Amino acid sequence: MTFISSLRRAVARGIVVATLSTAALSTAALAQQGTPAPGPLVEAEWLSKNLDNPKVRVFEVSVDPGLYERGHIPGAVNLNWHTDLVDTVKRDIVSKEKFEALLEKAGVTKDTTIVLYGDNNNWFAAWGGWVFDIYGLGDQVKLLDGGRKYWEKLALPLDTRTPAPAVSDLTLSGPKTELRARLSDVLAAADGKNGTVVVDIRSPDEFSGKLFAPEGSKELSIRAGHVPGAKNVTWSKAVDPETGKFKSKDELKKLYADAGVDGSKPIIVYCRIGERSSHTWYALSRILGYQVKNYDGSWTEYGNSVGVPIANLSGTVWQGR
């Protein structure tokens, strides 16, 4: 072997080693920057290491929108469920055009990992996830498991500054009608005509008709009770009360299977206005992979409708107040 040949081989080996080293460093850097694990949830620890990741956009969707101003996850954009996720004139979800403009202002693209969180164990964050999914972004959306509750439990940072991300260009799809139940769907299920299981996720007292709505609620119905044939699995049974995190997949399967909900039939979930039921929708649809529609009209529509069948176990009668 000549000296020149040996030199060429040595140089080639060096280039290969350097290339492999660079690739290893790049892989390590990506791992540190963080691509979240596949699935519908992210952990607080992962998010805390990815707050500066340009491919991650965080949104707060809380029952109390004022929480955001008092302190939020650094870089998070506030979504007010009263105005940003609904039509403010007619009772409906936000239009595709308005939602598209809102997300472009927040810098969301087709490559963005969207992390949603909120108070009350992610009630309205899950509602947000449902709306995102309706407009074709479901695969990009993840809930921060445990929401604000677990983030604060870990004493992770909060900020009061409002971010100003670069405006993006985004085209939404949908709406995906297979994710949303209408009154006609619920009536067909109540009559046993569409082979669908209905799950009422309200409290036992609301389900039985003892209560028209939780104390302090402004959106009321003038009839109490539940959709005939509905299964009652209170939404909060799906979470760990100490952390606010979802129970394990096996625990969730057992919870719903014990109530006769095993994913073998299509499912409709409802509550009072659709926000608590979106949490159950997330558990059943995104975590367990069942075929589920959220009935966002829920009891404020059903319990105010004329002539619909109702099961009122408590016999409570509306007294006009």
Which residue ranges define each predicted feature?
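Solvent-exposed loop/turn segments at secondary-structure junctions
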Residues: 63-66, 82-86, 120-123, 148-150, ...
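Helix-loop module immediately N-terminal to the HCX5R catalytic loop
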Residues: 85-113, 234-266
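Mature N-terminal segment immediately following signal peptide/propeptide cleavage
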Residues: 36-65, 69, 75-78
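C-terminal soluble interaction/assembly domains
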Residues: 254, 259-315
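Thiolate-centered catalytic microenvironments shared by cysteine-dependent enzyme domains
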Residues: 94-193, 210-211, 225, 276-293, ...
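Bacterial N-terminal signal peptides
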Residues: 13-28
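N-terminal secretory signal peptides that target proteins for export/translocation
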Residues: 1-9
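Active-site neighborhoods of enzymes that stabilize oxyanions during catalysis
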Residues: 32-41, 49, 84-85, 148-227, ...
